[in-house]
């Protein structure tokens, strides 16, 4: 479910819908709903929206297919897709089971590769302290590595970062095309207000983000700085740590506008990650909507966005950069610099590339 678009994993999907719609593309959107509810906002950009439940978790654990794939096997999905002879864009490897089951009617098929999935799950296993979850992530990584060969059977793969383009191009050939991540391009930053706290936002149901949040708690817990950790999900482990420190609080995100208000009032956005996978959508989103950004190597290396961020890797470096930036006001010139560099990540230009590739496939994939 890509709305509200308030964490990295759904930002690319939602703003891709908006961009394609703005260019006149009719979209029949198929979405698995598990907790976020049906969203009327999607009707603004889609001709029709179909909702499906995920399958039994217990049965899916026992499958030779990856859990994230097997839980999305759905007969109604295949029936609805086969009503039309339109090209199909699968959002992530995990949505591709209709291809694996060989139940499509010959439609052109394309996959948006959000990550090198088996590497992503290996990283989750390394970040996970729970033994059961760690073993699950390891097994899922192995299954995903085997399952990835399904990309041999699709007409095109749209990669999300230059590094991952190299990987997919080497394995699956010229049908792999780099399409920069989709994101919100509206500048929300209120330049007249100097922010008064430090913000970290992310989906803390994901162990990688929990690890990043714990790192930040440990970094700022004995400082004079106010840290806000924002997520639409409440993590018990983080809640226990946060309550110990008066200068750190949790903000439960209620919607996209809620996150925008935090961006407007935060002076610094801190974005550490411990996985060098894909491009972090939260980085792009923050550069458009937030003020200063401090990020580590894993977050910004080889993104083309290095010059727009302050780099810090250790706790000491984060604290030093924080002190420096809190003494500065956010100059409007910074926004203009960002706009120039972020033009390379224009959602409209990326949407045009997708349309061009799909509509003139033979010319582009030779």
Where are these regions (language model features)?
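Acidic donor-binding loop of glycosyltransferase active sites
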Residues: 263-278, 289-291
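Short hydrophobic beta-strand element within catalytic cores of glycosyltransferases
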Residues: 282-288, 292-296
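N-terminal subdomain of nucleotide-sugar transferases
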Residues: 1-49, 84, 220-221
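Membrane-proximal helix-turn-helix segments that form the acceptor-binding/catalytic region
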Residues: 15, 75-82, 116-120, 128-157
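Donor nucleotide-sugar binding/catalytic pocket of nucleotide-sugar-dependent glycosyltransferases
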Residues: 138-188
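Conserved catalytic-core segment of nucleotide-activated headgroup transferases in glycan assembly
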Residues: 12, 178-242, 249-264
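A charged, aromatic-enriched C-terminal amphipathic alpha-helix characteristic of glycosyltransferases
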Residues: 72, 329-366
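Active-site proximal beta-strand in glycosyltransferases
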Residues: 87-88, 104-127
């Amino acid at each position: 479910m890509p709305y509200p678009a308030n964490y990295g994993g759904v930002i690319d999907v939602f703003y891709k819908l908006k961009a394609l719609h703005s260019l006149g593309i009719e979209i029949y959107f198929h979405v698995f709903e598990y907790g976020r509810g049906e969203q009327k906002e999607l009707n603004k950009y889609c001709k029709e929206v179909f909702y499906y439940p995920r399958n039994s978790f217990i049965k899916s654990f026992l499958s030779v297919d990856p859990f994230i794939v097997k839980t999305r096997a759905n007969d109604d999905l295949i029936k609805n897709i086969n009503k039309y002879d339109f090209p199909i864009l699968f959002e992530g490897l995990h949505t591709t089971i209709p291809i694996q089951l060989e139940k499509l009617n010959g439609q052109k098929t394309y996959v948006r590769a959000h990550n090198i999935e088996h590497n992503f799950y290996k990283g989750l296993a390394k970040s996970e302290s729970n033994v059961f979850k760690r073993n699950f992530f390891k097994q899922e990584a192995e299954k995903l590595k085997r399952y990835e060969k399904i990309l041999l059977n699709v007409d095109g793969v749209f990669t999300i970062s230059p590094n991952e383009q190299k990987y997919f191009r080497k394995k699956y050939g010229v049908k792999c095309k780099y399409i920069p991540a989709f994101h919100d391009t509206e500048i929300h930053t209120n330049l007249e207000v100097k922010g008064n706290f430090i913000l970290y936002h992310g989906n803390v149901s994901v162990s990688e983000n929990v690890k990043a949040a714990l790192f930040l708690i440990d970094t700022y817990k004995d400082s004079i700085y106010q840290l806000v950790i924002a997520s639409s999900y409440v993590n018990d482990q983080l809640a226990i740590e946060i309550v110990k420190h008066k200068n750190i609080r949790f903000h439960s995100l209620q919607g996209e506008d809620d996150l925008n208000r935090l961006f407007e009032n935060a002076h610094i956005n801190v974005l550490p990650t411990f996985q060098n996978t894909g491009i972090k959508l939260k980085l792009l989103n923050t550069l458009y909507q937030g003020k200063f950004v401090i990020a580590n190597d894993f977050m910004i290396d080889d993104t083309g966005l290095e010059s727009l961020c302050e780099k810090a890797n250790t706790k000491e470096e984060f604290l030093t950069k924080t002190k420096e930036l809190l003494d500065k006001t956010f100059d409007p010139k910074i926004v203009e610099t960002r706009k120039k560099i972020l033009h390379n990540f224009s959602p409209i230009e990326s949407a045009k590339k997708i349309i061009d590739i799909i509509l003139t496939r033979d010319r582009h994939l030779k």
